[in-house]
Amino acid sequence: MRVIFAGTPEFARVALERLLAAGFTVPLVLTQPDRPAGRGMKLQASPVKQCALEHGIAVAQPRSLRLDGKYPEEAAAARAAIEAAQADVMVVAAYGLILPQWVLDTPPRGCLNIHASLLPRWRGAAPIHRAIEAGDAETGVTIMQMDAGLDTGDMCLVERLPITADDTTASLHDKLADLGGRLIVEALEMSACGGLPRTPQPAEGVNYAHKIEKAESQIDWRQDAEAIARRLRAFNPFPGGATQYGDESIKVWEAHADPAIAVGTAAPGTVLSAGADGVRVACGNGVLCMTLLQRAGGKRLAAGDFLRGFDLPEGAVLDGAASGGTP
């Protein structure tokens, strides 16, 4: 079976590697254009492009696939490449571009998407983050037959995965990437034998995983400690949690709710204690114990090491609404 692959980040690279290892022919890869990255802001190829080049696969990087859009020449060139590839199916994983109808219609077996949620829950751009943030007990991967809607196509394969109490977006991403790679191989093998099932998504339980914005990193100490801890796990590795003490900006990377400590009459954001085992802060309900922190321009440090270079006394008040420098 000939497979065009469309994807960009590490999540997609894992799937591409699994397809190649399973023996599928991939004549063409579509991925986002190279972007400036790193301290030097040099152009950097996506993980999928790097993988494709390592395997000698042709790469197309159009800025748009809309023939009537802003970049019609790039879209037309991509169309020619897609048609010339004579693929049976296209596999899409975190590509980052909307696929026009002509793309969906070109491969005889259509386009299969690897989506990191249990559809129809968490359609959209950030399903892993939002599942953790919401406190979901489980998530999973859905292999979907794409249509013109936003993650609205028929479900072909679904597999569930528990979300553990210490999962971050980083750790859950890796588990789901591995699961997605395995499931898409299964789906294509079933399709080759003519037996890939399709089930319409239920109308109930639809919600959307909106893109993560950097401004969401600001900690609101009026919230429940458990909710803040979930957000910090959801926003690790990006954008982290942010708070302010005086003129200093602090990033928070790891924390947990501490039910053993009473808030008393302390206002939300008040430091209750600060030691090697963590910085405990009063929240709207409960106490948050911060264990991995970072000051502007510094490294991520365990609480004890952080406090050796940063005075954060008991009774200090952190401001989750303030904005300061970005570490």
UniProtKB/Swiss-Prot annotation:
UniProt catalytic activity: L-methionyl-tRNA(fMet) + (6R)-10-formyltetrahydrofolate = N-formyl-L-methionyl-tRNA(fMet) + (6S)-5,6,7,8-tetrahydrofolate + H(+)
GO MF annotations, alphabetized: methionyl-tRNA formyltransferase activity
Transmembrane intervals: none
Enzyme Commission number, as recorded: 2.1.2.9
Domain of life where this protein originates: Bacteria
Coiled coil region boundaries: none
Keywords on record: Protein biosynthesis, Transferase
InterPro entries per UniProt: Fmt (IPR005794), Formyl_trans_C (IPR005793), Formyl_transf_N (IPR002376), Formyl_transf_N_sf (IPR036477), Formyl_transferase-like_C_sf (IPR011034), Met-tRNA-FMT_C (IPR044135), Met-tRNA-FMT_N (IPR041711)
Positions that bind (6S)-5,6,7,8-tetrahydrofolate: 117-120
One GO CC term, this protein: cytosol
Function: Attaches a formyl group to the free amino group of methionyl-tRNA(fMet). The formyl group appears to play a dual role in the initiator identity of N-formylmethionyl-tRNA by promoting its recognition by IF2 and preventing the misappropriation of this tRNA by the elongation apparatus.
PANTHER family, sorted: METHIONYL-TRNA FORMYLTRANSFERASE (PTHR11138), METHIONYL-TRNA FORMYLTRANSFERASE, MITOCHONDRIAL (PTHR11138:SF5)
Record-stated family: Belongs to the Fmt family.
Protein's UniProt name: Methionyl-tRNA formyltransferase
Organism: Delftia acidovorans (strain DSM 14801 / SPH-1)
